[in-house]
């Protein structure tokens, strides 16, 4: 009798283990369902930032001047040089050096083959397929019926909006393709740290992957570079660390290896306890942990800081955010910023208003549309769904120059477009900060 009990016990343990796993999976599925319902209900609120519906009906109704902001706007100078300042996004450019895409939309054949260019890392495509990560992302299916021409619409020309020949300059002047101005993407690590070329908008997509047992609570984010002819290149991946008191996202140029010890680790995003302030770091070592053990060359740099305005009184409306980045040199390189303690961090200097060699950006205030009873921004066809995450980043001295814009096009698909002086890691970190929950801002 005792022997039979011993023989049955392993089977009983196995059944019990399977039941526990099923219960855990059912609980996770239920929590994910509740979260999705809450998010869908939240998107229907009038305080979400909506894409301007008049942006696609240009001839139907004239728009106000504040809704006609081009994605890239380099004003036509009276002389042959545009003045440049450290605290502004403008750059020293001659008119013949401004490469502006055409105003007209690109025409893409419906049966064009969707391909993905991956960085030249050995075995990257095989590793993507092995881990069931889609390397050929069909963005046209994920935008819920949005036409390709809307998603691939090019920004306005670099000439001034007040110019009388603006309508003909876009078609008459052959613009150099943006792909030729992005440089060599084979060295992916160098590319994600380099500022965007002046006069070029780097267009990207972020895919949020919730597949797997715990990815509903800790999803993985993949950032792709959009190229001509519907090609995409993988750039960055990030995932929120599980055992961390504050939000902590590790950023990697490898879609599979998202560990801090990996060779592909390029930075991280960390928040405070309330989730209202974030800092983007590179792959360097924390000066407090490596004091006296590492040289200055290996000390980590602060690439950006993001601060969301708290909403302690419960007033609803669009989020208000500020972005602080290091200034740029005359050679258009970012000034290395390596604080040795928290009192000298980007956030601390911004709060103390000691902004020497720093650049402060902020989100563009959306316009209240009385017809739709919602806040709207003109994303020029790049954002198609309402979300509190939709925003545009500008500088106060040049509010028409969109440094970065971010918004939703599907449930788990977002567009991210950035310009000089941001780099890919900075832009990705700013976008990730929008995903994280904020206790005092909702």
UniProtKB/Swiss-Prot annotation:
It is found in: Nucleus; Cell membrane; Cell projection, Cilium; Cytoplasm. Residues 145-162 have a biased composition (Polar residues). Keywords: Cell membrane, Cell projection, Ciliopathy, Cilium, Cytoplasm, Developmental protein, Disease variant, Membrane, Nucleus, Secreted. Associates with the IFT complex A (IFT-A). Interacts with SIRT1. It comes from the Eukaryota. One of its GO terms (biological process) is embryonic neurocranium morphogenesis. Residues 23-68 are annotated as: Required for association with the IFT complex A (IFT-A). Residues 163-175 have a biased composition (Low complexity). Negative regulator of the Shh signaling transduction pathway: recruited to primary cilia via association with the IFT complex A (IFT-A) and is required for recruitment of G protein-coupled receptor GPR161 to cilia, a promoter of PKA-dependent basal repression machinery in Shh signaling. Binds to phosphorylated inositide (phosphoinositide) lipids. Both IFT-A- and phosphoinositide-binding properties are required to regulate ciliary G protein-coupled receptor trafficking. During adipogenesis, regulates ciliary trafficking of FFAR4 in preadipocytes. Expressed at high levels in testis, ovaries, thyroid, and spinal cord. GO terms for molecular function: enzyme binding; G protein-coupled receptor binding; intraciliary transport particle A binding; phosphatidylinositol binding; phosphatidylinositol-4,5-bisphosphate binding; protein-containing complex binding. GO terms for cellular component: 9+0 non-motile cilium; axoneme; ciliary basal body; ciliary base; cilium; extracellular region; nucleolus; nucleoplasm. It is linked to Hepatorenocardiac degenerative fibrosis: An autosomal recessive disorder characterized by progressive degenerative liver fibrosis, fibrocystic kidney disease, and hypertrophic cardiomyopathy with atypical fibrotic patterns on histopathology. Disease onset is variable, ranging from childhood to adulthood. InterPro entries: Tubby-like_C (IPR025659), Tubby_C (IPR000007), Tubby_C_CS (IPR018066), Tubby_N (IPR005398). This is Tubby-related protein 3. Belongs to the TUB family. Residues 101-177 are annotated as: Disordered. Pfam families: Tub, Tub_N. Coiled coil: none annotated.
């Amino acid at each position: 009798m005792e022997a039979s009990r011993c023989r049955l016990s392993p089977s009983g343990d196995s059944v019990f283990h399977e039941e526990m796993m099923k219960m855990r999976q059912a609980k996770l599925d239920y929590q994910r369902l509740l979260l999705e319902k809450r998010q869908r209900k939240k998107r229907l609120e009038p305080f979400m930032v909506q894409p301007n519906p008049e942006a696609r009906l240009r001839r139907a109704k004239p728009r106000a001047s504040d809704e006609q902001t081009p994605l890239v706007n380099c004003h036509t100078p009276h002389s042959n040089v545009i003045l440049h300042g450290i605290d502004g996004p403008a750059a020293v450019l001659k008119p013949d050096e401004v490469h502006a895409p055409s105003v007209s939309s690109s025409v893409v054949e419906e049966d064009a083959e969707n391909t993905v260019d991956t960085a030249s890392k050995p075995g990257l495509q095989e590793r993507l397929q092995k881990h069931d990560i889609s390397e050929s992302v069909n963005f046209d299916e994920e935008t819920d019926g949005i036409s390709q021409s809307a998603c691939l619409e090019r920004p306005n020309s670099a000439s001034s909006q007040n110019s009388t020949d603006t309508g003909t300059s876009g078609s008459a002047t052959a613009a150099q393709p943006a792909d030729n101005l992005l440089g060599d993407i084979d060295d992916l690590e160098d590319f994600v740290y380099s500022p965007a070329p002046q006069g070029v908008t780097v267009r990207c997509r972020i895919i949020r992957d919730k597949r797997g047992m715990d990815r509903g609570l800790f999803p993985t984010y993949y950032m792709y570079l959009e190229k001509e002819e519907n090609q995409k290149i993988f750039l960055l991946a990030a995932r929120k660390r599980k055992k961390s008191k504050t939000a902590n996202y590790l950023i990697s140029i490898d879609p599979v290896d998202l560990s801090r010890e990996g060779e592909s680790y390029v930075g991280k995003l960390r928040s405070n306890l309330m989730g209202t302030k974030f800092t983007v770091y590179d792959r360097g070592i924390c000066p407090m942990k490596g004091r006296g053990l590492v040289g200055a060359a290996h000390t980590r740099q602060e690439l950006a800081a993001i601060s969301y305005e708290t909403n302690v009184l419960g007033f609803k409306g669009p989020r208000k955010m500020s972005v602080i980045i290091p200034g740029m040199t005359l050679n258009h390189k970012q000034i290395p910023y390596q604080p040795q303690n928290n009192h000298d961090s980007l956030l601390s200097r911004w709060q103390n208003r000691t902004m020497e060699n720093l650049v402060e950006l902020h989100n563009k205030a959306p316009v209240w549309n009385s017809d739709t009873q919602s806040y709207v921004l003109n994303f020029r066809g790049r954002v198609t769904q309402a979300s509190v995450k939709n925003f545009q980043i500008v500088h106060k001295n040049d509010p028409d120059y969109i440094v970065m814009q971010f918004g939703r096009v599907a449930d788990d698909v977002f567009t991210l477009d950035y310009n000089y002086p941001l780099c890919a890691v900075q832009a990705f970190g700013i976008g990730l900060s929008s995903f994280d929950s904020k206790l005092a801002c909702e």
